[in-house]
């Protein structure tokens, strides 16, 4: 029984897992979930993720949800496959873990709100809340200031090598690069170079093909 990833490829959380699977050069089945029809809140999906959110993931008899837990499982379990996505000693692993937490607690909440307001709402025919955009642009700028300082001394957030701490940013960055928010990244040279590096990875190019 092979790996199955449940969810729409348009979802940043689903894309986070697809990118990890592609970095590891692993075969998997992407199982569509019609969120507009509310299928993520019904059986059989709700058995896989009782919170009714995408993605859900199966590897044999193992069932997981929460995208970052899934990516860590893949990176650890298939460490000998594809590209290494984890730090290689306890201290480096701790630093990587710090920046994984920063992504989930500081970067993603703000980036997700901006993506919703600037990208998703127009797609759904909804009106963008300009005040919310301005507020979250300011918040994102402050986060990216910290990143700029970190990336002056380190090629990647976790150290010299690309890890999950960097990969986890890719879906939100990919959406924001097509909006005016791109200027927040471009105006910080180390952040800009880091972002370009991540989005130019072959595995990411393969991952975004699923959105077509």
Curated annotation (Swiss-Prot):
EC numbers for this chain: 2.5.1.18
Positions with a binding annotation for glutathione: 11-13, 40-41, 53-54, 66-67
Keywords: Auxin signaling pathway, Transferase
GO MF entry, a single one: glutathione transferase activity
Keyword Transferase carried by entry: yes
Domain of life of the organism encoding this protein: Eukaryota
GO cellular component term of the entry, any: cytoplasm
Enzyme type, top EC level: transferase
GO biological process, one term: auxin-activated signaling pathway
UniProt KW Transcription keyword: no
Domain GST N-terminal: 1-82
GST C-terminal domain location: 89-212
UniProt-listed Gene3D superfamilies: 1.20.1050.10, Glutaredoxin
Catalytic activity: RX + glutathione = an S-substituted glutathione + a halide anion + H(+)
Family statement: Belongs to the GST superfamily. Phi family.
Role, per record: Conjugation of reduced glutathione to a wide number of exogenous and endogenous hydrophobic electrophiles.
Descriptive protein name: Glutathione S-transferase
Organism the protein comes from: Hyoscyamus muticus
Source lineage: Eukaryota, Viridiplantae, Streptophyta, Embryophyta, Tracheophyta
């Amino acid at each position: 029984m092979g790996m199955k990833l449940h969810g729409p490829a348009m979802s940043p959380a689903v894309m986070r897992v697809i990118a990890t699977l592609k970095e590891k050069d692993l075969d998997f089945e992407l199982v569509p979930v019609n969120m507009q029809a509310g299928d993520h809140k019904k059986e059989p999906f709700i058995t896989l993720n009782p919170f009714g959110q995408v993605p859900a993931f199966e590897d044999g008899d193992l069932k997981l949800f929460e995208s970052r837990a899934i990516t860590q499982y893949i990176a650890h379990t298939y460490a000998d496959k594809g590209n290494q996505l984890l730090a290689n000693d306890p201290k480096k692993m701790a630093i990587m873990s710090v920046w994984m937490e920063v992504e989930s607690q500081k970067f993603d909440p703000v980036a997700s709100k901006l993506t919703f307001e600037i990208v998703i709402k127009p797609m759904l025919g909804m009106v963008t809340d300009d005040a919310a955009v301005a507020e979250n642009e300011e918040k994102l700028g402050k986060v990216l200031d910290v990143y700029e300082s970190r990336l002056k001394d380190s090629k990647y957030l976790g150290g010299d090598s690309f890890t999950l701490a960097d990969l986890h940013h890719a879906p939100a960055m990919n959406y924001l690069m097509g909006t005016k928010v791109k200027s927040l990244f471009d105006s910080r040279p180390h952040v800009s170079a880091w972002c370009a590096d991540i989005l130019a990875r072959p595995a990411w190019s393969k991952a975004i093909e699923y959105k077509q």
